[in-house]
Amino acid sequence: MKFPKKIKMSGFEINLVLLDHEISYEVSEQQGSFVSKPPLTIYLDKKIIERGDRTSLNVLIHEVLHFVYYQYQLNLTKQLDDESKEEKEVNSIANGVIEMLLDTDLKEWILKTIREIK
């Protein structure tokens, strides 16, 4: 299964760009990065994603969750009381994860990767 070049979530198109390891990690010291200004883009360490293992899934899901945080404006939950804040944040994250798993072009890649993890 080929890794998609873009996904659509919540009506937004998000570019998925695989970067050479030297650029991703050695230069910027990160395995992935979400850019919230248009065009929305998630940069991922190509070497890590191509391994197709637990770390690959973790990095991918981590960066998609940055989009969820941005899209559902979770930075604004500071104004809510603790119980309301927690419920809004957890519900938003759950909605974003379900959308990523069921409604994006990442679904097949994620399922294949999960099946192949030993």
Where are the regions a protein language model picked out?
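Active-site recognition of the HExxH zinc-binding catalytic motif
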Residues: 58-70
